[in-house]
Amino acid sequence: MTSHPANRISITRRTARWSDDDVTIADAMDLWGFAAGAANVIMQLSSPGVGYGVVESTVDSGNLLKHPWKRARTTLSYLAVAILGNAEDRAAFRDAVDTAHRQVRSGPASPVQYNAFDRDLQMWVAACLFVGLEDVYQLLRGQMTDTQAEQFYRSAATLGTTLQVQEQQWPPTRADFDSYWDNACAQVHMDDVVREYLRDLVDLRMINPLLRIPFRPLLKFLTAGFLAPVFRDAVGFGWGRGRQRLFEWLFLAVAFGNRFLPVFIRQGGSYLLLADVRRRVAADKALI
């Protein structure tokens, strides 16, 4: 079984498969993952509870538009801990996130009811992270066999269970995940408030104009390319065959060059972030 075409990106040209070896989600911790970062934020916030939870959050230190680099570090550190870390790393990060999440809940005037401890919302965020990692991995390393896809998926549950998602909540098979994903995507909705917030993000309104002007067109292109039609339509981004071809050719070239990069370059950043988390824990410093 596969997801509905509107709910996943469609790639007609991709690099040849590197190998038939066993795989895990850790193999997806590649430096090129940053290219899909903004798209994944859009995916997550397209669930109304997550969208308003972020837009209305009073946790100023985690505000993406006010502290973009700090927020990026927190998200990337979470991925490093969830995928590469051990049980102690995950417990420490869970405590830090729980402290911040206690302040994130809807108020009387909120148009959507939400609570950051809602396991269904956390499952959605974890699912978006998984889909983003799977998309980037297959663009860089080629399409997985059915067996590899199942291995990859089964190793990814810690994306959710590092926080409040229960093991039994994570769909047991890749086919079950596709069913979950299609049902969840049917609930995608974005109003003007969340849409404007996300457009400000992609327009890089929060960074220095000297960086914004040259990088904004590339970010918009990459973000739209990594969005499935259901999300692209929700946020109002245009796309066409020409852009799709350019996106595919770009990642064919990136994938070719990526083959020659040693693992410590492709994945070293994630291990440095994990080491930083451990250093902060040892020094009793804040993680987020």
Task: Show where each model-derived region lies.
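Mature, function-bearing regions of proteins
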Residues: 1-288
